């Protein structure tokens, strides 16, 4: 490799096991040595001496010059004064155009980073409200004479049209993705998070987030893409995912993918299809996915359940729109319970429990709103609909059913976040959860009796008690099956306990053999004997007991160049940090998927959604890429036949 680095003309042949001269092979001018074009040099002992003699020969210099000027303007033309002046003027024009384009790129970046609308309703010259982007460009022109002159006089390329904006957004997205792929391919491990969402046209799409440790030893969760889906089936999701992963990980890096996490209802079939191609990609429950919402999604294939959750969301919507409505509800409760403190209404994360526990208060509140005469017609109409809903037998049945189920889901989630966790603890918590759900399933008849005891409403035909029990049994069975699939692999939680500083004192006396065994089973790329030796040394040192978590320990090793000394521990730390597992360690929890879902709630256009989301979510990455604008310009200039010139000669 050092020979090739020193001499760019040197070429090797693995068939003849000899060295040749590439320029001489191509052109073979008069006097070219046969040794370097036909026979080849095999004498490694005297290779350096032969190379020095050959590169000093006239024929080699002639051939090298021919290769250099191959496909270029002739030497005579390049030496012509008129040609030189033309080149200089062309490059001056390119410099000017690149400056203008870079200024426009900066404005697009700003609007994207702060989620501002690029375009207004009227972007004509005389418009008083041309939009944020055009306004920024006009403001920049007032400070930049070159930009102002360009906007006033340009006829070929102005840079402010919708077409140019879209092309720039595409180029910016491409450059940022290329950077993310480069970071992933230089990292040791990769995890993916894929969440099912829908766009404003209700078309299914997949949100893909990549998690890895970058070259600066910082854990990153990067937005990568909204992948459009043909349908929300497992086959469609798996096909789309495998297609994107193939662009991120080449064939020889498939073992890097160590984790996959999903929040949709088709996860079990998807994860098996992905693991067929990426065998190390364990399916886990991700900290970014709320377990209660996942259980809701898992049962949403049942139409009655889907209707119930749509209805329960109506209470949150009703009270979040107006503080006046919430105050009125407080007054109703205060009148009934004058000595009680203020109730903390939570119609979001605890909507089911809140509605179940205060059902009578809510009915009284809605009826009072209808009778008071102090509310607008929309409020009165919505209050009447919600009051009828609270009297509906089917709604009451599912309200009570999920009121019994959700506390156990919350309890399981809390247990899995505890620090003092082991395989026995995990299996015990999951077994206890399954037993509680089974108890609810076995007592469905009592739930049905309570909900059917009240007067029926005339809204629509209610389900029979038998139908309710059948649907509730299906709900319980679905939750039990989903729990088995989601937590079938939990060794990642166990292996994380090997690196908890507050347990090092305990491990010093009794080494955690079971946890090590589970770790080796889950991640066979580790060397068990060396890992045990390294961990034993870490546990015995007082200095390491101040470690607050895996990220702290990893940073300590990397900052002090200990990655070779503690090679297996560092590898384990990379696995643990890259895996988006449920943990109390804040440094490992910064949900990109939640930020993206918040971004989707903003009034953002679907056109160029991927590019706008990338500029918003990855604005720090874009800022850190010092050559970002130049890379965008190069890509923009090479896309089409541009009438304006952007490439130097």
Predicted regions and their residues:
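Alpha-helical structural modules in large enzymes and assemblies
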Residues: 1-649
